[in-house]
Amino acid sequence: VAETTIKPFNLSVAKNIIGPLAQTNHFLVTFSSLTPSVENYLADYTGIKSIRSFLSRNVGILCNEAVIPTSTLATAEVKDNFMGVPQQFAHTRFYTDFSYTFYCDEDYTLLRIFEGWMEYITSGANDDVEQNHRAYYRRMRYPDSYKCNTMYINKFEKNYKRTLRYKFVNAFPKSIDPVPVSYGSADILKITVSFNYDRYIVNG
């Protein structure tokens, strides 16, 4: 009879072998600035004059939840290299969107910033027709004018021995989730924003 390699073990043994496991509640989101075009538009659209200062100081504190993105590979199948053995080869790498959930301050600053950012992206026709006009239409801005390269998420542990830093290249807000409000017991208002980007770079 062949000797089995399966042996019982408990959590203390596993912890000694594997070591401490990563925790979900140690992270920091940083977001320092937008493009000058977006910042200037937001200053007029929202009346917020210190957007860069607000983002650099407050985003990390107000971010309640974040999603670390991943990627997938699109493949093509080849059947002719080896008889009866299909093979797949990668041809494109796709990156999943990432999202941040923020606490909303009583001035609704972040909600106004992200709404204004998306408004800027779609406001290319504003010089042609007023928004209140029945013939108003949307024209998209050039990507270089609204995509930014200052969004990061840092994943670390409480001992700070190891940090993973994700940099998002050419990020912009793709959607804002509906924000529910209701009568009853009060709760903190939160907004969740999903972002698209070209790719991410991981350092760590």
Name these PLM-found stretches.
Residues 1-204:
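Glycine-rich, low-complexity intrinsically disordered segments
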